[in-house]
From Swiss-Prot:
Cofactor: [4Fe-4S] cluster
Superkingdom of origin organism: Bacteria
Name of protein: 4-hydroxy-3-methylbut-2-enyl diphosphate reductase
Protein role: Catalyzes the conversion of 1-hydroxy-2-methyl-2-(E)-butenyl 4-diphosphate (HMBPP) into a mixture of isopentenyl diphosphate (IPP) and dimethylallyl diphosphate (DMAPP). Acts in the terminal step of the DOXP/MEP pathway for isoprenoid precursor biosynthesis.
Keyword check for ATP-binding: no
EC nos: 1.17.7.4
Cofactor notes: Binds 1 [4Fe-4S] cluster per subunit.
Species assigned in the record: Psychrobacter arcticus (strain DSM 17307 / VKM B-2377 / 273-4)
Keywords from the named record: 4Fe-4S, Iron, Iron-sulfur, Isoprene biosynthesis, Metal-binding, Oxidoreductase
Length: 318
């Protein structure tokens, strides 16, 4: 059985930064270090950080006044920021800079009194944070749509003063169809100068298309609550591959590969390479060939840590 490995795959710059922020905080400060929501959507990563002292909570009321808290990579609403300031919490913001870019866009539309349309998945923490960045005091409203049917039912205050943004981890193909529907219904709608779907999401979706074109089965390493990992699985299925989303190698079933000549492996943006390597090793133990890594875009994006976490440890407290 041939094994193909997608390129790029796994960690993106925003995930690297978010995990590094938690790691640095654990090194520099006395526990407990609180993290609002899973810092990234991966069970292995969250469990590892929890074992080293991070305390994960869903809401700030679980954090004692005056504590250190880290906001997850998915971002938070303005109300959460305000509550943290009110309660004298020391905040390290691990929001992905590409999510922050969308927050800035939404805030500007609100300031201008426009309606905004957010293309995204209801209930996802990134969507909740972005919706919570829209200030309604200037007369505008923000609307959430997930698909073309939502667009069809959408009613806005002024179709000529309307803009859209998107969640950063969506299916590019699905989102393009929703944007087309918006532009058809609202010809004057404004969009971002550059696509809000992040570079890593785009690159991993392109890579899984390349992978699925030559494989019968595709394995996506990622947690069930990872939006971008789910989109990779769906994309492989649309290309007529059997696709499985797995947290780790223990979730694989040898029967998946009966009679299979080729299997592809990729990973969502929050899945660490160690889990991918364990999957590859299990496939080889079951008779697979040495993996062949496909060609792909080389990623060299990096995001810096907050200034307070970049100060050399020897200078902390001086």
């Amino acid at each position: 059985m041939q094994i193909y490995l997608a390129n790029p795959r796994g960690f993106c710059a925003g995930v690297d930064r978010a995990i590094a922020i938690v790691n640095e905080a654990l090194l520099r400060f006395e526990p407990p270090i609180y993290v609002r929501h899973e810092v990234v959507h991966n069970k292995f990563v969250v469990s590892d950080l929890a074992n080293r002292g991070a305390v994960f909570v869903e809401e700030l009321h679980e954090v004692p006044d005056g504590s250190i808290v880290i906001f997850s990579a998915h971002g938070v609403s303005k109300a959460v920021e305000d509550e943290a300031e009110r309660r004298d919490l020391t905040v390290f913001d691990a929001t992905c800079p590409l999510v922050t870019k969308v927050h800035i866009e939404v805030a500007k539309f609100a300031q201008d009194g426009m309606d905004a349309v957010l293309i995204g998945h209801a209930g996802h923490p990134e969507v909740e944070g972005t919706m919570g960045r829209f200030n309604h005091r200037h007369g505008g409203r923000i609307h959430l749509v997930e698909n073309e049917s939502d667009v069809e039912a959408l009613s806005v205050q002024d179709a000529e003063r309307l803009a859209f943004v998107t969640q950063t981890t969506l299916s590019m193909d699905d989102t393009a169809r929703v944007i087309d529907a918006l532009r058809e219904k609202f010809p004057h709608i404004q969009g971002p100068r550059k696509d809000d779907i992040c570079y890593a999401t785009q690159n991993r979706q392109d890579a899984v298309k390349h992978l699925a074109s030559r494989c019968e089965v595709v394995l996506v390493v990622g947690s069930p609550n990872s939006s971008n990992s789910n989109r990779l699985r769906e994309l492989a299925e649309r290309m007529n591959c059997r696709a499985y989303l797995i947290d780790n190698a223990t979730e694989m079933d040898i029967n998946w590969f009966d009679g299979i000549q080729s299997v592809g492996v990729t990973a969502g943006a929050s899945a660490p390479e160690v889990l991918i390597q364990e999957v590859l090793q299990q496939l080889q133990d079951w008779g697979g060939d040495l993996p062949s890594e496909l060609s792909g875009i080389e990623e060299n994006v990096t995001f810096s840590l907050p200034k307070a976490l970049r100060i050399p440890m020897t200078q902390v407290g001086k």
